[in-house]
């Protein structure tokens, strides 16, 4: 009679094995965390106060990192935030070089993340459809 081994069972169905995460994904996650701390504690630019980092992607060779940001609040001043990030790029890269201990610090590209706007548009479309269905249901 064999003893039930949950690890063996999970491994046999593919749930127990830990999948390897690519280095570029780990570095992108570390950059996202460091950048969030920088925005909260060290960067004093008022244009970057209502900015949050939504996601960070890195190329496999870690030469380019794209940082997607969102702007919170009613005033969406994307061009001003782009200029502020461009001005702070050197400071951010030097901080990342010190904290991440990488041989080469990747080039940073800041991109406005339009996901929230697209979600709002889709929600409006769904609300319009629901309203039309409700109006048609009441009239019939």
Curated annotation (Swiss-Prot):
One of several proteins that assist in the late maturation steps of the functional core of the 30S ribosomal subunit. Associates with free 30S ribosomal subunits (but not with 30S subunits that are part of 70S ribosomes or polysomes). Required for efficient processing of 16S rRNA. May interact with the 5'-terminal helix region of 16S rRNA. GO terms for molecular function: ribosomal small subunit binding. SUPFAM superfamilies: Ribosome-binding factor A, RbfA. The gene is rbfA. It comes from Desulfotalea psychrophila (strain LSv54 / DSM 12343). InterPro entries: KH_dom-like_a/b, RbfA, RbfA_dom_sf, Ribosome-bd_factorA_CS. Its main location: cytoplasm. This is Ribosome-binding factor A. NCBIfam families: rbfA. Belongs to the RbfA family.
């Amino acid at each position: 009679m064999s003893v039930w081994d949950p690890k063996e069972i999970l491994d046999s169905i593919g749930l127990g094995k830990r999948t390897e995460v690519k280095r570029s994904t780990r570095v992108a996650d570390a950059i996202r965390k460091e950048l969030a701390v920088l925005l909260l504690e060290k960067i004093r630019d008022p244009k970057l106060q209502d900015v949050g980092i939504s996601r960070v992607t890195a190329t496999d060779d870690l030469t380019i990192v794209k940082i997607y940001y969102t702007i919170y609040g009613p005033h969406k001043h994307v061009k001003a935030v782009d200029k502020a990030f461009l001005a702070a790029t050197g400071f951010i890269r030097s901080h990342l070089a010190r904290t991440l201990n990488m041989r080469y610090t990747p080039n940073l590209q800041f991109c406005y993340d339009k996901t929230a706007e697209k979600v709002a548009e889709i929600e409006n479309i769904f609300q319009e459809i629901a309203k039309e269905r409700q109006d048609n249901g009441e009239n019939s």
